[in-house]
């Protein structure tokens, strides 16, 4: 399978998935937080979080992160991604992301007068490497996609 086909399968996981397990490292060790996420065409992953949470604070000090998104259910072939990259806080309301975020969670589309952040901030993870697990096509042989 060609690299473009691997990217299409990765995009399928990002489109179907909504919950990312985000791994960070801080002065207290390793930590994982589940966050609702959306993505863009360049495979960047976005989420909203309270800036005071452990994972948000850790990203300010060490932006190297890892994560997983799995979209398979019991009885289905495994389909998911594991990835590493760099994360950072981004400024602004980002209505484009807010609309995608609310739609993905089956919530009404926000109005521009709504306080969609409610004290939270947007963050972006730019992957440098993505491992695809697609049991239907590859068994448990991970397909590596370098960015």
What spans do the regions from the language model cover?
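Short, surface-exposed beta-strand-loop junctions and turns on beta-sheet-rich folds
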Residues: 53-55, 74, 138-140
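A generic structural signal for nonpolar/aromatic side chains embedded in well-ordered alpha-helices
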Residues: 14, 58-59, 101-102
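Short amphipathic alpha-helical segments
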Residues: 6, 54, 59-63
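Extreme N-terminal tail/first-helix region
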Residues: 1-19
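Charged, gly/pro-rich active-site loop segments
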Residues: 2, 79-147
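Short, solvent-exposed aromatic-acidic interface loops
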Residues: 50-54, 104
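Short beta-strand segments
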Residues: 17-51, 59, 66-70, 82
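Short Pro/Gly-enriched beta-strand edge/turn motifs at strand-loop
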Residues: 15-21, 105-108
